[in-house]
Every structure is written in C-alpha cells, then in structure tokens.
A protein has these predicted regions:
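Bacterial Sec-dependent signal peptides at the C-terminal "C-region" and cleavage site
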Residues: 16-26
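Proline-centered linker/hinge motifs at extracellular inter-domain junctions
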Residues: 198-199, 206
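Aromatic-lined ligand-binding clefts that engage carbohydrates, nucleic acids, or primary amines
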Residues: 35, 61, 95, 101-122, ...
Length: 208
C-alpha cells in the first residue's frame, strides 16, 4: 500500500465567504427609492449637523423618488429651480437592519453629479468631492459627471449601525451655480460572514 503524505494532498474547499461578498448581500434600500430632501436656499439646521441626526424633524421636507436631479438623467424628481439659485441639496431617509452587529461590510452605490458627503446615524462615513465648508452655499471640490453607479465601501459598519431603524443623510454639492446638471441616486447593500462550513469540491491527487 502506497502512502500519500498529507503535504502532497490538496483539498479544494469552496466557501462563499472566501470568494467575495455576493453570497450574503442584502439590499437595504434600492436606487430609485424615495428620499426626503431640502433645497439649499438656506441651511436646514442653522449651520450645524443636527439635520444629519436620526432625531431631527424633517416632516416638513418634501419627498421624491430618486434620481433627484436636473439636466442629466431621466425620471425621478426634477429640481427645476436649482440652476442659478442654490448649490446644495440635503437628503434623508431611513432603512432597517436586523442584528446590526453581524454586518461586516457596507457598500453604497451612487450615481452623482458633482460631489456628496454621507452620514449614518449622525456619524460621517464618506466624502466624495464634498466641501470642507458645509454651509448651504458651498460647492463641490471637484466636478464629476453622472451616468453610472459607482461603489464606495463604508468602513466599520458595526460602529454606527443599530438594530432596527437607521438614518442615512447625504449632502449633495454642485460645482457652481451655473452648472448645467445635478444628480443624486443611491443604493445601500450590507454583507454578513457566511457561517456555513466549507465543502470539499475535489481532492488532488484522487484517493486510491
């Protein structure tokens, strides 16, 4: 009987957790979803970040389906009064998470023009071409054209997600008042580790 040392035996183990996130993805809200929004003719909370907190009262804000936009894109909610009038728009919506401590990763997919910043439950989580000055009349730090969704990984979700209802807030920036377009549309996906045991797909060399 010929012995095969273990070092010469390769086991091909197939585990979803080892081959990317897709097996455990959950969409927390989809693109095209409804958001509350506030036109940046003035600041919604007097210049501070209270507007990005979960307990802020946005009941008098209008709401509309995304994309919220003008110039580019189709459908959604059109801001026909934005050009030459205001350069920022403030957005809020809620989403639900069960067993938040188990969420290992978050991806935010955004189709945008020109820049934006994101808070979840009042915590800053992403800045893409936003302004260091968060006043209502600030501008994007760099121009960006919409057209495709881009994926942004949000780090350390366990530090700001809670069980049940969560609040995401977005501040959108245009590059200048005379810009020909503006857009914001987003989708949020969560990921959890795969706890199922790995399966043996093949043994090389085969036994015998």
């Amino acid at each position: 009987m010929r012995l095969k040392p273990f070092a010469l035996t390769a086991l091909a183990l197939v585990a979803a957790a080892g081959f990317g996130r897709e097996g455990n993805a959950e969409t927390l809200f989809e693109s095209g979803a409804k958001w509350s929004y506030y036109r940046g003719n003035d600041h919604p909370s007097g210049g501070d970040l209270e507007w990005a907190e979960p307990d802020f009262d946005d009941s008098d804000w209008p709401s509309g389906d995304t994309p919220i936009r003008y110039g580019d894109g189709n459908g959604g909610t059109v801001l026909a009064d934005m050009r030459n009038t205001y350069s920022t728009v403030f957005f809020r919506r809620t989403f639900n998470v069960a067993k938040a401590a188990q969420v290992s990763a978050l991806d935010l997919l955004v189709n945008y023009d020109d820049g934006f910043m994101v808070w979840i439950n009042g915590e800053p989580v992403l800045d893409v071409g936003g302004s260091a000055d968060l006043s209502h009349d600030s501008f994007a730090s760099v121009g960006h054209e919409s057209g495709n969704f881009e994926t942004f990984a949000l780090a350390n979700p366990s530090q700001y997600l809670v069980d049940g209802e969560n609040l995401i807030a977005v501040m959108g920036f245009n590059i200048n008042l005379t810009s020909s377009d503006f857009m914001m549309d987003a989708e949020l996906r969560s990921y959890r580790p795969d706890k199922s045991p790995p399966k043996v797909a093949s043994i090389d060399p085969p036994p015998g």
